[in-house]
Amino acid sequence: VHLTADEKAAVTALWGKVNVDEVGGEALGRLLVVYPWTQRFFDSFGDLSSPDAVMGNPKVKAHGKKVLNSFSDGLKNLDNLKGTFAKLSELHCDKLHVDPENFKLLGNVLVCVLAHHFGKEFTPQVQAAYQKVVAGVANALAHKYH
């Protein structure tokens, strides 16, 4: 991912304020609600029968936190996203058979959640930088599919 120094600074500054537990659960939950076909990958999570059930599901929240912790690792290695996400790409491709389009969907949902949480602080410039990052992460996660 090519980010300018200003974009990297903006991404890093905002990410330092992110509550990974809260934002991770909300982002994954919203993905499962807005794109219900993604729920098929989470059969073991229990009740996903309604938006309230999804958003209150502790397994969704826990996995969302795990996802954002991995995303945090990516932010520390923006110049080597493919290397950073190689094992996760392999897992999601070979074992879980996740449609790589879902990575893009989750990235876009994450951007929406960040905008919701940070309001005016999430300027168009910050959003543009985050869109580059989530696209790069989605591409890295889809790498083993190519």
Curated annotation (Swiss-Prot):
Red blood cells. Residues 2-146 form the Globin domain. GO terms for molecular function: haptoglobin binding; heme binding; hemoglobin alpha binding; metal ion binding; organic acid binding; oxygen binding; oxygen carrier activity; peroxidase activity. Keywords: Acetylation, Heme, Iron, Metal-binding, Oxygen transport, Phosphoprotein, S-nitrosylation, Transport. Heterotetramer of two alpha chains and two beta chains. Heme b binds at residues 63, 92. CDD domains: Hb-beta-like. Belongs to the globin family. SUPFAM superfamilies: Globin-like (SSF46458). The modification S-nitrosocysteine is found at residue 93. Involved in oxygen transport from the lung to the various peripheral tissues. GO terms for biological process: hydrogen peroxide catabolic process. The modification N6-acetyllysine is found at residues 59, 82, 144. The keyword Coiled coil does not apply. The modification Phosphoserine is found at residue 44. The modification N-acetylvaline is found at residue 1. Pfam families: Globin (PF00042). The modification Phosphothreonine is found at residue 12. This is Hemoglobin subunit beta. The lineage of its organism: Eukaryota, Metazoa, Chordata, Craniata, Vertebrata. GO terms for cellular component: blood microparticle; haptoglobin-hemoglobin complex; hemoglobin complex.
